[in-house]
Amino acid sequence: MTPDPRLADSAFLKAARGEPVPHTPVWYMRQAGRSLPEYLAVREGIGMLESCMDPDLVVEITLQPVRRYGVDAAIFFSDIVLPLKAVGVDLDIKPGVGPVVAHPVRTLADVEAIPDLTPEHVPFITEAVRGLVGELGGTPLIGFAGAPFTVASYLVEGGPSKEHARTKAMMFGAPDVWDALLRKIAGISASYLEVQVAAGASAVQLFDSWAGALTPADYRAFVMPHSARVLERAGALGVPRIHFGVGTANLLGLMGEAGADVVGVDWRTPLAHAIALVGDRGVQGNLDPTLVFAPTEVMTARAAEIVEAGRAARGHIFNLGHGVIPSTDPDQLKRLTEFVQTYPR
């Protein structure tokens, strides 16, 4: 669809492309979520996956933080396992646990049984994105997908894991199955991003939540080529690509090399160090999410340090170093947003 002409002035998109910005743009991972009373109200009694498949609800939830905070970008409300559910994988998201897969992937036959994703699998995504773009006007919408390693971990472990033992056992011990699985997921994630961009998303973010469990050598050998496939297909869409993982200080350079325009940085890595690692790419981050619980002057002082450090990057998008914590005070996040957006350039 035809982009809103006001998007040409978006500070978020300018920063993502490495262009001069009127102010440091800001948005937050999980900005639409349990920290907002209006989110809890509309989600009451409705499961996560059911919520993600209801276009009207997705539009409302995605818009809530834009209305409340005035952030510089909206991120599409969904879940990284939704594309798997859409193609027929038997899974659910259990409160307090996370995604649970009924029949974990163990063999090549298990991989081959997973269908490729087509737009016909996710008509509700197209409808929701189109509705959002119409409502957002000059505020860009970020589409997103899960990166192959993180999605593979859920499929192999059968749910969330701290050790990723079965995942790594397959990676090291059954490389043919591993390669087939990550190729399959890369195709699904890339197709999911294509659907969102075709409907009007202005940027994409690839989430690799569990990549920090890998050494640089293992990431390069077993994971990076598959993430690169997703980012390459996203690059062909002509929108900025953000690549984010948690605990990835030793992988930031490689995550950029995989094909990102902007590399997300968690709170444990000094932003100046991250900028040196990613080279001629933008960065996103990276305030510790718990600093929103600190006195306002402490929070804003740390935010100022991050904004100042971000000046050395090709482009800087302010964010937390991970998702908004559910018990966060929305009023404090509003103060943070206004502070960053009005901080002198």
UniProtKB/Swiss-Prot annotation:
Q: Which family does it belong to?
A: Belongs to the uroporphyrinogen decarboxylase family.
Q: Does the keyword Cytoplasm apply?
A: yes
Q: Which reaction does it catalyse?
A: uroporphyrinogen III + 4 H(+) = coproporphyrinogen III + 4 CO2
An example Gene Ontology CC term for this record: cytosol
- One MF term in the entry's GO annotations: uroporphyrinogen decarboxylase activity
Its subcellular locations are:
Cytoplasm
Name of this chain's protein: Uroporphyrinogen decarboxylase
Q: How does it assemble?
A: Homodimer.
Could you tell me which pathway this protein works in?
A: Porphyrin-containing compound metabolism; protoporphyrin-IX biosynthesis; coproporphyrinogen-III from 5-aminolevulinate: step 4/4
Q: What does this protein do?
A: Catalyzes the decarboxylation of four acetate groups of uroporphyrinogen-III to yield coproporphyrinogen-III.
User: Could you say which EC number(s) this protein's record lists?
Assistant: 4.1.1.37
Looking up HAMAP family in the UniProt record yields: URO_D
| Site positions for Transition state stabilizer | D79
Q: Name one Pfam family in it.
A: URO-D
> Which residues pair up as cystines?
none
Q: Any idea which positions bind substrate?
A: R30, Q31, A32, G33, R34, D79, Y154, S209, H322
A Gene Ontology biological process in which this protein takes part is: protoporphyrinogen IX biosynthetic process
What UniProt keywords apply to this chain's record, in alphabetical order?
Answer: Cytoplasm, Decarboxylase, Lyase, Porphyrin biosynthesis
